């Protein structure tokens, strides 16, 4: 995969397909290639750009030691767009990627053609209470003690909430030991800190791009009403609830998810 020097880091990315640009942003810890169920479909219709965000698991983007924010990662994305000569693009963000996508649409409205926000929130206060500790937050959403956070246990809880039982067993049995050996869990402090600082609620009304907010009815990692709030505050937003889908709708309900996204991007 090629790399681009953007915003002070070397960012690993991939481009497939032809057509209007579509940039996919993965959730906390996930690398760009985790979009495989979407890329193989979307590349038939769009120029699909995926990338490894800072501190992504199994990624090859630089992992800076200094703290950063969602706005920082939105700036990374703009830098990649500039590197690729992309003036405007459709933006699809899943989970943490949706938080980055909101920052991008708020701060760079002229660069966003259409926006898709999947399984995401606009504030750390909308994260499921069971997962607050993973992001170093106390129950009142104030910053807790980073040193006391058992990241492996926290991601185990998140995975159990996000995936059906079969996928959960696969992830815990196969991927978690690899992540442990590579020191990935301990490297996630940067992304977790960015999630803890997420707060775009009061700026959602400034988003100009036509927006699809899509969430599963069995969502447990983030509070379901977060999507309803986003859809109500973003002008020209459409809310879709995928019946039976969990936080991991892009994997478990991939056919329905892909169809909803393509229908939205092609509409109007």
Residue ranges and their predicted role:
Residues 9-62:
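Conserved HGGG/HGGXW glycine-rich cap/lid loop of the alpha/beta-hydrolase fold
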Residues 50, 54-92, 259:
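Active-site loop/oxyanion-hole signature of alpha/beta-hydrolase fold enzymes
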Residues 93, 97, 101:
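Gly/Ala-rich beta-loop-alpha elbow adjacent to hydrolase catalytic centers
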Residues 106, 113-143:
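Flexible "cap/lid" loop of the alpha/beta hydrolase fold
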Residues 126, 147-196, 201-203:
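Conserved alpha/beta-hydrolase catalytic His-Asp/Glu region
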Residues 207, 213-215:
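Short beta-strand/loop motif that positions the catalytic acidic residue
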Residues 218-222:
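Acidic catalytic loop of the alpha/beta-hydrolase fold
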Residues 242-258:
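Catalytic histidine-centered segment of alpha/beta-hydrolase-like enzymes
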């Amino acid at each position: 995969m090629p790399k681009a020097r953007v915003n002070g880091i070397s960012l690993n990315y991939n481009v497939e397909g032809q057509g209007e640009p579509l940039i996919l942003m993965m959730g906390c810890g996930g690398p760009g290639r985790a979009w495989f169920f979407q890329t193989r479909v979307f590349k038939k219709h769009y120029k699909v750009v995926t990338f490894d965000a800072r501190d992504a698991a199994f990624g090859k983007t630089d992992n800076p030691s200094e703290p950063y924010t969602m706005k920082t990662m939105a700036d990374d994305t703009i830098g990649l767009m500039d590197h690729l000569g992309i003036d405007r693009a459709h933006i699809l963000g899943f989970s943490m990627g949706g938080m980055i996508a909101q920052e991008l649409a708020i701060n760079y409205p002229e660069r966003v053609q259409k926006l898709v926000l999947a399984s995401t929130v606009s504030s750390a206060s909308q994260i499921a209470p069971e997962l607050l500790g993973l992001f170093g937050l106390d129950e009142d959403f104030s910053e807790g003690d980073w040193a006391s956070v058992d990241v492996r246990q926290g991601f185990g809880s998140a995975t159990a909430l996000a995936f059906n039982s079969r996928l959960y067993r696969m992830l815990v049995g196969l991927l978690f030991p690899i992540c442990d050996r590579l020191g990935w869990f301990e490297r996630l402090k940067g992304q977790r800190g960015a999630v803890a600082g997420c707060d775009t609620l009061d700026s959602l009304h400034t988003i100009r791009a036509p927006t699809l907010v899509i969430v599963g009815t069995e969502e447990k990692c983030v509070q379901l009403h977060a999507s309803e709030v986003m859809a109500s505050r973003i002008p020209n937003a459409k809310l879709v609830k995928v019946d039976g889908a969990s936080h991991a709708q892009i994997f478990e309900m991939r056919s329905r998810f892909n169809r909803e996204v393509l229908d939205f991007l092609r509409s109007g």
